[in-house]
């Protein structure tokens, strides 16, 4: 009788441990995952980086300015989060390579990429957009996310897969007046996302596109949206 009770208690204990472990896995799926977030020292990018770190991921933030990186890292580390950072202009190959190399050196690999960097150097009619503005907008908003993804895929494959999140805008579906080249670039990101999703699925890498509305970007103080709206 006592032996039966003991065996029953052991079985109950094993079941409880399995259930607790399962709950922990579901609750903290990002524990010890490694995430890169571009343009992540303020606004939406900073909020994404903070949330990933709060969910126990190791996060590498980036910005074009060292002082912004230092401030963001100090703030998030002050909250007890696992965050490091480096300067990265996503339009420069050497900066993209450094960002990837830092994550691999510090944490052994990469599981998550959030491509958040974007610019809007022009406000007005599409007919007034110069070639220089087109080049800058498409280089940062479209080409850079594609090349960042290309840079991290080999590292994700080494870890059995990963996740890429491309931050786009509701402008991909409903163009906002005045944000002419920006609207086009964000629509292009939808095509990039869909193509990458098909190509990378066999490698167990998910690709998703996040479409934010401009009011959310403005409320987060992102990229001068509020200032440009006032000028308009």
Curated annotation (Swiss-Prot):
Residues that, per the record, bind substrate: 169
Enzyme Commission number: 1.1.-.-
Glycosylation sites: 183
Signal peptide location: 1-19
One of the record's GO cellular component terms: peroxisome
Residues annotated as catalytic: 182 (proton acceptor)
Residues binding NADP(+): 36-60, 186
Subcellular location: Secreted
Enzyme class: oxidoreductase
InterPro entries found in the cross-reference section: NAD(P)-bd_dom_sf, Sc_DH/Rdtase_CS, SDR_fam
Keywords: Glycoprotein, NAD, NADP, Oxidoreductase, Secreted, Signal
GO molecular function, one term: carbonyl reductase (NADPH) activity
Example of a GO biological process term: retinal metabolic process
Keyword S-adenosyl-L-methionine: no
Keyword Lyase in record: no
Note in the entry: Three homologous proteins DHRS4, DHRS4L1, and DHRS4L2 are derived from gene duplication of DHRS4, and the gene cluster is arranged in tandem in chromosome 14.
Function: Probable oxidoreductase.
Family statement drawn from the similarity comment of this UniProt entry: Belongs to the short-chain dehydrogenases/reductases (SDR) family.
Protein name (database record): Dehydrogenase/reductase SDR family member 4-like 2
Organism, as annotated: Homo sapiens
Gene: DHRS4L2
């Amino acid at each position: 009788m006592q032996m039966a009770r003991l065996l029953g208690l052991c079985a109950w204990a094993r079941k409880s441990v399995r259930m607790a472990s399962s709950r922990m896995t579901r609750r903290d799926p990002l524990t010890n995952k490694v995430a890169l977030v571009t343009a992540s020292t303020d606004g939406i990018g900073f909020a994404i980086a903070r949330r990933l770190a709060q969910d126990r991921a190791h996060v590498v933030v980036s910005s074009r300015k060292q002082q912004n990186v230092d401030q963001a890292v100090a703030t998030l580390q002050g909250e007890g989060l696992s965050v490091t950072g480096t300067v990265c202009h996503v339009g420069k190959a050497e900066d993209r390579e450094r960002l990837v190399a830092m994550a691999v050196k510090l944490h052994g690999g990469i599981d998550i990429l959030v491509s958040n960097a974007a610019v809007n150097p022009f406000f007005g009619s599409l007919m007034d957009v110069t070639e220089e503005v087109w080049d800058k907008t498409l280089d940062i908003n479209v080409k850079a996310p594609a090349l960042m993804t290309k840079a991290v895929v080999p590292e994700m494959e080494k870890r059995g897969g990963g996740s890429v999140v491309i931050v786009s805008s509701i402008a991909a579906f409903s163009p906002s007046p005045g944000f002419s080249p920006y609207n086009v670039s964000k629509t292009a990101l939808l095509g990039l996302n869909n193509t990458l999703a098909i190509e990378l699925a066999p490698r167990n890498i998910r690709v998703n596109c996040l479409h934010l509305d401009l009011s959310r970007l403005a409320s987060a103080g992102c990229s001068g949206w509020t200032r440009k709206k006032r000028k308009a």
